[in-house]
Regions:
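Long, compositionally biased interface segments
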Residues: 122-156
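Aromatic-patch recognition
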Residues: 2-120
Length: 156
């Protein structure tokens, strides 16, 4: 069944024989999407499952790595209103929409937002018990972060 995640309205659009139906995100606990081009499945879980750790989050976490230390990805939409000043004829007249991605570490002790800075992320992961040998090849990109978590979780 074709499904599209609506990040802005926090829900799922499902294509059925009768047309496209919208399911409110609050009614969905988790879902799995299979990407036909990559032959890979992605698991999404509602942020309310982690509400005891971070009550202010809303949306769906994409689970990038499962295990003792989970790597989660949360994509949200930010809207920047126009800041045009007529008197100065300066600023932007357009509303801008940004897609912001944040990464989180989840374990039995809590849910932690990973810092954007590589050095701060490495320091935080060391404090969570990651060995320094796993963190040597981490450059600060998601493509390097996922193998670090996968290696750590497979060794536990």
């Amino acid at each position: 069944v074709p499904v599209r995640l609506d990040v802005y309205n926090f829900g799922l659009e499902v294509k059925t024989n009768e047309g496209i139906r919208f399911i409110d995100g609050a009614m969905v606990k988790s879902f799995e999407c299979r990407d036909l081009t990559e032959r890979e499945s992605k698991l999404y879980i509602n942020t309310k499952e982690y509400s005891s750790m971070q009550p202010h989050l809303s949306g769906f976490f994409e689970i990038l790595s499962e295990g003792k230390q989970q790597l989660l990805k949360l994509t949200v939409v930010r809207i920047k209103e126009p800041d045009y000043n007529v008197a100065l004829n300066a600023g932007s007249r357009d509303t801008k929409i940004y897609k912001v991605t944040n990464y989180y570490l989840a374990n039995e002790s809590g849910l932690y937002k990973l810092p954007v800075s590589r050095n701060k992320t490495v320091k935080m992961l060391k404090n969570q018990g990651f060995p320094e040998t796993l963190l040597t090849n981490y450059t600060g990109h998601e493509t390097d972060l996922k193998p670090v978590f996968d290696s750590f979780n497979s060794s536990q």
